[in-house]
Each structure stands twice: as structure tokens, then as C-alpha cells.
Swiss-Prot record:
The gene is malA. Belongs to the glycosyl hydrolase 31 family. It is found in: Cytoplasm. It holds the Pfam family Gal_mutarotas_2. Transmembrane segments: none annotated. Its EC number is 3.2.1.20. InterPro entries: Gal_mutarotase_sf_dom (IPR011013), GH31_Enzymes (IPR053497), Glyco_hydro_31_AS (IPR030458), Glyco_hydro_31_C (IPR048395), Glyco_hydro_31_N_dom (IPR025887), Glyco_hydro_31_TIM (IPR000322), Glyco_hydro_b (IPR013780), Glycoside_hydrolase_SF (IPR017853). Its main location: cytoplasm. This is Alpha-glucosidase.
Length: 700
């Protein structure tokens, strides 16, 4: 039996079994030996050969959430999950694993949340009440391991401590939350500019354009195709003149070519096999080698390549295929799952590194299977350093794969989804699962990535519009499509559908200051931007079954329509809720019918900053805006921590508001625009406060 040590710091318990060599070191500051035993932590540990098995009891009314990107219900009970990054193209509901492995789950028992994070990048298996009805069983294929027990009592408390341990999310620039367009692939460069011009002429605000692999010369990284993109600097300048950013895809495969500079400069920094020879595989450029990102010197070299690439004016980097994938070895998913006694039907082929690949981590040689899931984390880390090396204040990295800590460096999107009504619902489950696993900056391919190669594909315009609507408040907002897929850019739709998408995109921009305020909150505290309802109402068991609505921060509930219908029933949690579209105030813990295509409800006690220096205030609360201005509302007063400009103030109140007084001097009349809604046009800087007359903000 290996030795077991337990350390503790501020409600985080580190359990060390044997002498583990973790894939990444997450130091527990001021760690002290804990007096708590495993039994007091509610755990049992069994060692079977080269495996460690950790068990905890599972109560009937207990909820298990987290585990990252899983194509299942958000309450993870009665299923077994595998942590093993794969290229999961055209995935479906109930297929596992996918691209991202976050070995963190949160138990909510009797209203109290506790987190369990296993710092292993190997094929960890979580059995949540499947093999044993009353147990959670975690199997780690190593004889030594470290894991953490994180006390709540709120889900939010667990995520704050988890991100304190694994790293707070980076703060992207505001443009990164705008509307992006992408395709596999846009070219030549004149057509890229022409498309942007068409979009802007039709009134679509495009924040960024993504270039897929066809911009490269023979798919070689850090090159431009000589005919498709003969003047890349001109392209970048033309886009920047239009206030549009350029993001280029960068895979992890370096072409074997004696005349190719990155191959020559990278010698000694690529992955090897056990014999010490280079691991030579296949990827888009053909015969390929792969950077060993676990090596510090490799990360330094890669950061230099990224920095040089960015020096042209490229604004962002899109990391793809980084599970990591290699085309020379395709295995059946059942081989990945071979150790599991129960398997769901899944006939996928996945492309992975061979078993004999090795890496060098902190000077030690380790097998690929022991650290596989952390490969994209180290790639993102090196890419992030490339931005720092180039002295960029604005950092944008998008990654398909990830491991615990990826939030420090990158956005995550849910990969190559398939346009269908089932997928529409699944995307919300996936992004919410990532959000409550410490990855706040998430999104999906709007419109579904796959082209016309699958029978279940639905290319209807109604579904495309619903994708745009579903993702209205997703932190990452990008349409993307395969080479043989329809055009998902809305300018190519008939006017009726084009205008629908335009309304959705404009509404997103209207709420962008609120979304970006939540991004600041995420970077400071580790809170998710979008959340399942149970995140805010964790002691209400009913909320754990609501998976087609989501909270945007604490204050906004959005209920996208994820069916062919044009209306839907909306579950409102306890409290009072303001219908954004008609001003109705509704008592919560109720189910209401919404006939609006974009059902939005504001929670009592909310402050919502909007585009154009507008504010919505509903009840008593406080809020930190993206520019660090603190706004506080009391019964008859709104205070500002510093001088800010306000163009329009919307006050939600069940009692009439007749006028406001700005900074004890200027009196402004208030107009009632719809029920419970009072609007004051201010158009000036406010030094300190606004007083309300004729009503109070506090609801009776």
C-alpha cells in the first residue's frame, strides 16, 4: 500500500498517494498537514496493481455535475465517463469521450457543494452510479496520484477555489466576444475582403475573420499560400481598416522538409518514440513531426514562432487538431474504452498518437498515455507566451482540446458538430458543462460544422437561425462550416431570415458590455459567464433538470427555443423576474409561456450595462462594470464609484417613477415606455449618484 498524505489550505485538501509525477504542478500555497482522515473526507482508496481507485458514496438525491465536455445530461449520474482527448468529428449525443478532458466533478448533496479534482492527464475513468448504484468510482491508471477535495458550500465557492488552484482565466479583449465568421476555408484574399464588405454593407458587424488551413503553402505552418494569399500584409491592413480582426489556424504538425525553417530550427524539440528516434506521423502537410510541448525549450521555440507570425499584424491564433491527433494511426473507439465493462454503441474511428510516443516533462521521460490530455494545455501555454513575447496587450487564442488549467490561456469551442435539431440542444449542454468545470470562455460552431456527408444533416434556414439564437449569449460567437457545407453567413439568406439573424446579432452587441463585465468577473474570480440554472439556485432540485435555459451572469435568464416551435414554456426560478420585451413582472417558481422568439428575463436585483452607455436597473443590488466602475442601487438611489457617462437609464419598478435628480443638481423627467418600465434620457457624465423620485427601486 502506497503512503497517503493529506494537506489542507483554506478548505482545499490535497491528497497525495505515493510519489506522483503530475502532468502540471498546481502548488497548494501554505499547505499544512491536515488532521482530516480519508473517512472524514468521505473517501475510500483501493490500490489494484498499477491503478488507484477512489470511491465515495452516492446518495439518491445527490447531484453530480462538471467533468467538462460531455455529451450527456448536466447531472452526470448513471453513466461512466472517460478522460481521453480525441478528434471527435461528427459526434452525437451520448458519445464519449470528446475533445476536452477536465477531471473535475462537483457533488451537491443536501444543498452543499464539494469539488473533486484529479490531477492526472491519463485515461481516468469516472463511474457515477453505474457499476455501483450507490457509489462514485474514479479509476486512475497510475500507482501514484494527487487529487484535491474542494469545500464549498456553494458551487461558486468550489469554482473560485478550483481556479485559484489551476489558474484564473485570462481576460480577452472585448472584440473577442463579438460576431466572428469562419469557414473551411475562405480564399483567395480578395474574396475575404469582399465577403467582409458584403457583410458590413448589409449591416452586420463582423469582429473577426478566421482563416482555415487553405491559407498556408502546402499546409505548412507559418506560411502563406503564394497564389491564394500573395500579399498577406495587404489583407491584414484591409481588414484592420474595416475594424475587423484576423485569426489564423495553427495546427501542431510540422512538415518534414529540409528546406522548411520551422522543421530545421525545431530539431531536438519534437516528440520521440521509446527508441529515441523522432516520432514521424501524418497530418495535413504530409509527413509530419510534432512539437513536444511538455519540454520548456520547445515552448520557448514555439513562442518565438508565434511571436514572429503575430508581428505581421495577425490578431489571434486558432489551435486545432491538438488532442493531439495524428492521421497515421486510426483506432476504433472501443479500443479506447477496452477497459470498461459496459459500453454504449459507438463505432467511431479516432486518430491518436501511438503507444510508443514519449515526452520529456520537467526533465523526466514519460509515456504519452500518462500525459496525453495535457498536450493541448502546454501548446496553449506556449502560444500564450508567444503573444507575451510579441508584447501584445490583446490576446486571443481558441483551442479545440484542453485539460484543467486551459482557462488561463484560451477559449474552447465544441468542435466539429453536425447541424441537426438534436445537436442544437446538445450544444447548450456541452457549453454549460464546460462552463461549470472552470472553462468560462466557450462556444460552438454556429450552424453546425459538418457539410453534406451525413444523412441526419439539416440545412434548413429555420435551424440555422435557431443556432444563432441559441448562442446569443455564448462567450464565443462564431459561425463555421466545412468545405462542402452551405453558406452560413446570413447575407446569403433570403431577406426574412437574414433580418432575423441581424436582429439576433445586434441584440448580442447591445448586451456586449454586460457580457464583457462578466468576462472581467470570470478573470478575477473564476465564475462562469453562462451558467445552468442550478448554479444560481443549487438548493432547488427542480433546477437540475432544466437544460434548455441558461443564466447569463447572476442577473439574466435566457430560454432559447431549441425546437421547431416559435414559442415555448419557460421555467422561472424563485424570486421576481422582468420580461425584457413587454415589461411584465412575474413571480418566480413558475412556468410561463413565452411567445417571443428570444425569451429574456431579468432577475430582481440586477444592473445590466448596455451598448451606448445605457443602464438597466431593477431592484437593490451592486455590480462591477467591465471598466471597473462599481454601481450600487438602493431603495431610491443609484451610486457610482467614479465618474461615468450614462446616455439612458431604464428603471424597472412596480411603482411609478416620475423623475430623477443627477448629482443633486439636474432634474430629468422620466417616461414610462411600457409596463413597469421607466426611461430617463441623461446623456451626461455622472460624478456620484442619481436620486429617484415618485417611487422606490425595492419591490414590494
Amino acid at each position: 500500500m502506497q503512503t497517503i498524505k493529506i494537506y489542507e489550505n483554506k478548505g482545499v485538501y490535497k491528497v497525495v498517494i505515493g510519489e506522483p509525477f503530475p502532468p502540471i504542478e498546481f502548488p497548494l500555497e501554505q499547505k499544512i498537514s491536515s488532521n482530516k482522515s480519508l473517512s472524514e473526507l468521505g473517501l475510500t482508496i483501493v490500490q489494484q496493481g498499477n491503478k488507484v481507485i477512489v470511491e465515495k458514496s452516492l446518495d439518491l438525491k445527490e447531484h453530480i455535475i462538471g467533468l467538462g465536455e460531455k455529451a450527456f445530461e448536466l447531472d452526470r449520474k448513471r453513466k461512466r465517463y472517460v478522460m481521453y482527448n480525441v478528434d471527435a468529428g461528427a459526434y452525437k449525443k451520448y458519445q464519449d469521450p470528446l475533445y476536452v478532458s477536465i477531471p473535475l466533478f462537483i457533488s451537491v448533496k443536501d444543498g452543499v457543494a464539494t469539488g473533486y479534482f484529479f490531477n492526472s492527464a491519463s485515461k481516468v475513468i469516472f463511474d457515477v452510479g453505474l457499476e455501483e448504484y450507490d457509489k462514485v468510482i474514479v479509476t486512475i491508471p497510475e500507482d501514484s496520484v494527487e487529487f484535491y477535495v474542494i469545500e464549498g458550500p456553494r458551487i461558486e465557492d468550489v469554482l473560485e477555489k478550483y481556479t485559484e488552484l489551476t489558474g484564473k482565466p485570462f481576460l480577452p479583449p472585448m472584440w473577442a466576444f463579438g460576431y466572428m465568421i469562419s469557414r473551411y476555408s475562405y480564399y483567395p484574399q480578395d474574396k475575404v475582403v469582399e465577403l467582409v464588405d458584403i457583410m458590413q454593407k448589409e449591416g452586420f458587424r463582423v469582429a473577426g475573420v478566421f482563416l482555415d488551413i487553405h491559407y498556408m503553402d502546402s499546409y505548412k505552418l507559418f506560411t502563406w499560400h503564394p497564389y491564394r494569399f500573395p500579399e498577406p500584409k495587404k489583407l491584414i491592413d484591409e481588414l484592420h481598416k474595416r475594424n475587423v480582426k484576423l485569426i489564423t489556424i495553427v495546427d501542431h504538425g510540422i512538415r518534414v522538409d529540409q528546406n522548411y525553417s520551422p522543421f530545421l530550427s525545431g530539431m531536438g524539440k519534437f516528440c520521440e518514440i521509446e527508441s529515441g528516434e523522432l516520432f514521424v506521423g501524418k497530418m495535413w502537410p504530409g509527413t509530419t513531426v510534432y512539437p513536444d510541448f511538455f519540454r520548456e525549450d520547445t515552448r520557448e521555440w514555439w513562442a518565438g514562432l508565434i511571436s514572429e507570425w503575430l508581428s505581421q499584424g495577425v490578431d489571434g491564433i486558432w489551435l486545432d487538431m491538438n488532442e493531439p491527433t495524428d492521421f497515421s494511426r486510426a483506432i476504433e473507439i472501443r479500443d479506447v474504452l477496452s477497459s470498461l465493462p459496459v459500453q454504449f454503441r459507438d463505432d467511431r474511428l479516432v486518430t491518436t498518437f501511438p503507444d510508443n510516443v514519449v515526452h520529456y516533462l520537467r526533465g523526466k521521460r514519460v509515456k504519452h498515455e500518462k500525459v496525453r490530455n495535457a498536450y493541448p494545455l502546454y501548446e496553449a501555454m506556449a502560444t500564450f507566451k508567444g503573444f507575451r513575447t510579441s508584447h501584445r496587450n490583446e490576446i486571443f487564442i481558441l483551442s479545440r482540446a484542453g485539460y484543467a488549467g486551459i482557462q488561463r490561456y484560451a477559449f474552447i469551442w465544441t468542435g466539429d458538430n453536425t447541424p441537426s435539431w438534436d445537436d442544437l440542444k446538445l450544444q447548450l449542454q456541452l457549453v454549460l458543462g464546460l462552463s461549470i468545470s472552470g472553462v468560462p470562455f466557450v462556444g460552438c460552431d454556429i450552424g453546425g460544422f459538418q457539410g453534406r456527408n451525413f444523412a441526419e444533416i439539416d440545412n434548413s434556414m429555420d435551424l440555422l437561425v435557431k443556432y444563432y439564437a441559441l448562442a446569443l449569449f455564448f462567450p464565443f460567437y462564431r459561425s463555421h462550416k466545412a468545405t462542402d457545407g452551405i453558406d452560413t453567413e446570413p447575407v446569403f439568406l433570403p431577406d426574412y431570415y437574414k433580418e432575423k439573424v441581424k436582429e439576433i446579432v445586434e441584440l448580442r452587441y447591445k448586451f456586449l458590455p454586460y457580457i464583457y463585465s462578466l468576462a472581467l468577473e470570470a478573470s478575477e474570480k473564476g465564475h462562469p459567464v453562462i451558467r445552468p440554472l442550478f448554479y444560481e439556485f443549487q438548493d432547488d432540485d427542480d433546477m437540475y433538470r432544466i437544460e434548455d435555459e441558461y443564466m447569463v451572469g447572476k442577473y439574466l435568464l435566457y430560454a432559447p427555443i431549441v425546437s421547431k416551435e416559435e414559442s415555448r414554456l419557460v421555467t422561472l426560478p424563485r424570486g421576481k423576474w422582468y420580461n425584457y420585451w413587454n415589461g411584465e413582472i412575474i413571480n418566480g417558481k413558475s412556468v410561463v409561456k413565452s411567445t417571443h422568439e428570444l425569451p429574456i428575463y431579468l432577475r430582481e436585483g440586477s444592473i445590466i450595462p448596455l451598448e451606448g452607455d445605457e443602464l438597466i436597473v431593477y431592484g437593490e443590488t451592486s455590480f462591477k462594470r467591465y471598466d471597473n466602475a462599481e454601481i450600487t442601487s438602493s431603495s431610491n438611489e443609484i451610486k457610482f464609484s467614479r465618474e461615468i457617462y450614462v446616455s439612458k437609464l431604464t428603471i424597472t419598478s412596480e411603482k411609478p417613477v416620475s423623475k430623477i435628480i443627477v448629482d443633486d443638481s439636474k432634474e430629468i423627467q422620466v417616461e414610462k415606455t411600457m409596463q413597469n418600465t421607466y426611461v430617463a434620457k441623461i446623456n451626461q457624465k455622472i460624478r456620484g449618484k442619481i436620486n429617484l423620485e415618485g417611487s422606490v427601486l425595492k419591490q414590494s
